[in-house]
Amino acid sequence: MTRPAPLAGVGRVASAAALIAVLTVLSRLAGFGRTAVFTWVVQDSDLGAMYVLANAVPNIIFEIVAGGALASLVVPLLAGAVAAGDRQAVTATTGALLTWTLTLLVPLAVLLALAAGPLINLLGDNRSPEELAAGARMLRVFAPQLPLYGIGIVLTGVLQAHRRFAWPVIAPLLSSLTVIVAYLVFVGVAGPGASVAQAGRGAELILSGGTTLGVVVLSLSLLIPIRRLRLRPRPGYTFAADARARVGGLAVAGVVTVTAQQVALAVILRRVAGGLTEAPQVFNLAQTFYLLPWAVLAVPLATAAYPTLAAASAEGDERSYRDTLSATLRGVLLLSFLGAAVLVGAAGPIGRFFPLNAEATAGAIAGYAPGLIGYGLFAVLSRALYARGATRSATAAITAGWLAVPLVLLPLSALLPVADRVLAVALANSAGMLLLGGLLLVAVRRAAGSAALAGAARAAGAGLLGAVAGALAALWLLRLVAQGDGTPTRWVALGQGMLSGVLVGVVFLAVVWLVDRRDLRPVLAGLRRRLPARLRGRQKDGSPPEQGDGKE
């Protein structure tokens, strides 16, 4: 095991974040392609709706755990041992994490398969018996994804603790390509838009089995870089002494937040299932666009900073912790506002491009946009609190934010028409995520002091100005170029969406450069430093790139 070189200040974090961002763009483009192919393959069919509902159960668990539970558990437990070069402690902790993960998730997968019918009946409001039966069959095929997700999350955390960032981003790319192939095979067998009755059991199994195969690729491909670390974890339930003291609080935090998010998910799925036939597909598409800028813009910065925050906290280096967190937070705020502006500006063309209800899709995407700010704060601040062991305050904030989603959704879905059911979900999600982000800001200030949030208000103000200006410019452009003889074709809508996104980016960067260039510079500088190094394979002085920065 090679001891990673320590990060040399905020600039190194920005460079690592730029590498992650570049790879994440490719990975998320593949993920977007997967969703686009799925939307075109199933269209507005009842089979597509039941697939979304069934796949949401294990799939959202992955999003939940990867965002804050197991992933947040692994890095803090390993950071100190990795920094100290303690190979034995790293190996023991990794083995214990894998053992506990499989011990908990394998029985859970069995229970999920056994309870597939009642679960789908609970979620599938107003669906026919044939549709519910198809959903239950697919959920049984999806059940093995749970332990596979657990393995992948632990291995991802081990790699990130060693500052190996490349493969955790490459694995989803390979998974998406695998699932795309399954979708194409399905459409070759059943045809586009096939219903439950038309597709038959064989085509249905291609759809569900191919999706689970994608999760196999997602998780087990990470064994390749793990072998390069020369770790040989063995089964066992005992953690190393240093890790043992922290694992309980982190595990409880993960369980509580997962429970809160699952409550929100269950209410969301039931509300969506009670909408129009294609409402689950609209929800799936809108959520994909919502998660795209979050994963490409906010998560890379948070992921790159996480090992530094955990190591600084373990070593008692408060200055490094606060400097790293404040700089990362400012960057995440700016990029989250940029992503929100792009969602608003491009929502209309996106809705017209896909073969679903255009108004419902556009409204849902725009409704998700404000929540991107809170979710971006979640990406960095939850990690910051977990890194310093402040699990109770993190858990309280995250739980309150997620439980606010169904509390807002229930009355909102009753007030809005059935056709706007996904819009109600999007608005409720935004309300909950903004609350979550605000509570995390309060928790971090109490735990680490106001210095950890230095400049956050300035960056938020600049981001808000840039986002409003960029979104208004895009909406003005769309009104200007709108055809007078009806709805534009799908390919015209695609061009309009791309043009809107570019305009939002240009206007946003111009405004932020004028009012807060000091926070924008590190983000842009990190990207400039990283891209030439990756293209040339060498630094400007001729020396090879540093190890431990994600280069495998």
Predicted feature locations:
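Membrane-embedded alpha-helical bundles of multi-pass transporters/translocases
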Residues: 1-552
